[in-house]
């Protein structure tokens, strides 16, 4: 099973790396695409891209192949989500833009959010506590299981959108559909 997650993330990474202009979706903190094995307990159960995914000449670019334990932030996200939604084993973070949220809603995706300014001090002061708290809040704020979770940032925290799915290839396909619509909206029809 371990090889399956690595191969799935590798294939997803190839898809987004070959998508022209995918770099316009990459946030300042960079992206990562993750996939957890069933019932993940910690980052060692989650495949990610070491060093994250950056933008180079408009495209998504990764310096290394996916491996287990290569992410902490996105690993904590998918572990927290998977506790409530065991079928969701993969996620990709992209930059926040109101028009991307509108695109997701127009596509019929379930979108939820959380407000980082409402994060309790006890959570903020706990190393690694913010992400699980945010996932819990987004789940509470949604009547249906969300496909997309976002926040508008906070002091020193970049706003972010996270796409979720059953596996990394599904999430990459979704991201590429969003990219096409976003480029069209921005007047780029390449």
Swiss-Prot record:
Keywords: Thiamine biosynthesis, Transferase. It catalyses: 2-[(2R,5Z)-2-carboxy-4-methylthiazol-5(2H)-ylidene]ethyl phosphate + 4-amino-2-methyl-5-(diphosphooxymethyl)pyrimidine + 2 H(+) = thiamine phosphate + CO2 + diphosphate; 2-(2-carboxy-4-methylthiazol-5-yl)ethyl phosphate + 4-amino-2-methyl-5-(diphosphooxymethyl)pyrimidine + 2 H(+) = thiamine phosphate + CO2 + diphosphate; 4-methyl-5-(2-phosphooxyethyl)-thiazole + 4-amino-2-methyl-5-(diphosphooxymethyl)pyrimidine + H(+) = thiamine phosphate + diphosphate. Its EC number is 2.5.1.3. One of its GO terms (molecular function) is thiamine-phosphate diphosphorylase activity. It holds the Pfam family ThiN. Pathway: Cofactor biosynthesis; thiamine diphosphate biosynthesis; thiamine phosphate from 4-amino-2-methyl-5-diphosphomethylpyrimidine and 4-methyl-5-(2-phosphoethyl)-thiazole: step 1/1. One of its GO terms (biological process) is thiamine biosynthetic process. The keyword Transferase applies. It is an enzyme of class 2 (transferase). The keyword Nucleotide-binding does not apply. Disulfide bonds: none annotated. Belongs to the ThiN family. Condenses 4-methyl-5-(beta-hydroxyethyl)thiazole monophosphate (THZ-P) and 4-amino-5-hydroxymethyl pyrimidine pyrophosphate (HMP-PP) to form thiamine monophosphate (TMP). This is Thiamine-phosphate synthase ThiN. It comes from Methanothermobacter thermautotrophicus (strain ATCC 29096 / DSM 1053 / JCM 10044 / NBRC 100330 / Delta H).
